[in-house]
Amino acid sequence: MVDTSNLLPQTPRLLKVPLIILNIILWILGLVLVIVGGICVSFLSNFKDFTKASDAKSALSNLTTSIPAGVLVIGILFVIFTVVGCFVAYKEKLVGLVIYCAVMLILLVILIGVGGKAITLHNDDIINEVGGAWEHVANGTKNSTLTRLENFLKCCKWSNVSIDSSDLCPKDGDKIKYEGHYCGEALSDQFSSKIYAVGAAGLAIGIIELVAILFSLFLIIRICRSPRTRSYDQY
């Protein structure tokens, strides 16, 4: 039988230092997730009234709340648990490392799920979904929500062939503002930059997190195999 005991460093120190460094990197990236998620939540919060006024509530709410809110929450948890990870690694707390591994593994699954969902969203499908809802709202009683959206996106009408009236466009006196700047194009640019950034950041951080989990598992194994005095604090 192959002896695997020599495959790991002989002292926990050689494992905990890289683990602490990885946690510091993940803490910084957690702040990035908080910032990116906050920007997306702030941007997509402008679609709240529009989502309520449209028939595609479930599809649009998933886009406008689930993904950005998920990224924001994950970022906050990262900031908290990476600090915990640094502490338990430095102190070589065995039980703390086990709990840290379990929590980070759960976060890894969620992060890859959210990041994968964001990065696989097809921009054309999103725009078609929003475009259909846009025309529905334009013909409804709550079409004033479009004026607020157009003012936010600095655009007028969904496209040059859409049926929504330019009467809903923001006006500067009698002059229509943003004429010729269509909302479909403006929204497409915004989604391309924000949603894909969320997905790419999530997957990249997930890879680094996986390495950190492996180091913490190796550290747990090495601590268990290391000789300890009676006063050794394994908790």
Swiss-Prot record:
Pfam families: Tetraspanin. Residues 1-18, 90-93, 222-235 are cytoplasmic. It is found in: Membrane. Keywords: Glycoprotein, Membrane, Transmembrane, Transmembrane helix. Residues 40-68, 115-200 are extracellular. The chain crosses the membrane at residues 19-39, 69-89, 94-114, 201-221. Its main location: membrane. It comes from the Eukaryota. Glycans are attached at residues 62, 139, 143, 160. GO terms for cellular component: membrane. It is a multi-pass membrane protein. Belongs to the tetraspanin (TM4SF) family. This is Probable tetraspanin tspA. It comes from Dictyostelium discoideum (Social amoeba).
